[in-house]
């Protein structure tokens, strides 16, 4: 029987200076049957993505902490009120990736708020600032991102989604590691029927790498022996030329939005692109 991701119920409480989101993941019988302990992936217990339903104009990438078994908590940054799609990525010790989904109504911010995690980020786009294949997308701080693909993208075929990050003189820049990778990408179909969190070609998620390492040692039963990789190992795949390539096979035709997150300096920047997949 096909595995069905568990449901997750979000709630938001507001006080004078915080909007606190709590997310409880349901402990279903099917989930327990395949369950292994949830472990950090790229140093985070969960990667939570919020996408506004009004044309996907607002995008947030947050990192809740686990306060109890399957209960997660995060403070929302200063992002506008409204209805949002919610996607929560979890990783288990046996290498399984799980995405929980829901929708949530975000109330207005109480005033000046700060992210609860320095790696949290959010971005707003519109018809002027979004990009398409072959276009240059202006970023903040004088940077820009070019989507290098120029040929049509066809569903059912693996495509390398290629991007280049440049400075104000259009020279490629070196990228600092963001969550152990030179970049991250999120792809969502306009009807929210498809969601994927991608990493660049040539990189591998730390959880998966630990599982492979355990198998190489013949350790396929005692999962408790798995240990995190040193931070230096996670940072070996750094983009020195500002170029990123994300291999992906779009499952069906339609319009998709792609957010690409990079860290050319001490700040996370997000490029937003749309594509019509044939």
Summary of predicted features, one role per range:
Residues 66, 73-80, 250-251:
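Residue-level recognition of secondary-structure-to-loop junctions
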Residues 1-15, 93-153, 175, 179-181, ...:
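Extracytoplasmic/periplasmic copper-protein system
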Residues 35-46, 176-182:
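Short coil-to-beta strand junction motifs in C2/discoidin
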Residues 62-68, 236-241:
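Short beta-strand segments within Ig-like beta-sandwich modules, predominantly Fibronectin type-III
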Residues 18-33, 158-171:
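Beta-strand-rich structural segments
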């Amino acid at each position: 029987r096909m595995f069905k991701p568990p449901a997750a119920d979000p709630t938001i409480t507001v006080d004078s200076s915080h909007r606190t989101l709590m997310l409880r993941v349901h402990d279903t019988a099917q989930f327990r049957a395949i369950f292994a302990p949830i472990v950090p992936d790229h140093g985070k217990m969960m990667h939570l993505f919020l996408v506004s339903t009004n044309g996907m104009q607002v995008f947030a990438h947050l990192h809740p902490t686990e306060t109890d078994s399957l209960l997660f908590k995060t403070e929302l940054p200063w992002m506008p009120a409204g209805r949002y799609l919610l996607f929560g990525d979890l990783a288990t010790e046996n290498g399984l990736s799980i995405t929980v989904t829901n929708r949530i109504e975000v109330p207005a911010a109480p005033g000046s708020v700060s992210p609860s995690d320095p790696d949290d980020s959010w971005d707003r786009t519109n018809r002027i600032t979004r990009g398409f294949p072959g276009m240059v997308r202006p970023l903040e701080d004088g940077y820009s991102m070019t989507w290098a693909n120029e040929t049509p993208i066809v569903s059912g075929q693996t495509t390398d989604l290629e991007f280049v990050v440049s400075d104000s003189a259009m020279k490629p820049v070196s990228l600092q590691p963001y969550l152990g990778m030179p970049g991250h990408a999120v792809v969502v179909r306009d009807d929210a029927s498809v969601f994927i969190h991608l990493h660049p070609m040539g990189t591998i998620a730390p959880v998966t790498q630990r599982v492979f390492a355990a198998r190489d040692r013949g350790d396929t039963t005692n999962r408790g022996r798995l240990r995190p990789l040193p931070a230096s190992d996670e940072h070996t795949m750094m983009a020195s030329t500002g170029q990123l390539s994300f291999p992906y096979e779009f499952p069906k035709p339609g319009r998709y939005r792609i957010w690409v997150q990079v860290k050319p300096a001490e700040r996370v920047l997000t490029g937003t692109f749309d594509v019509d997949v044939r």
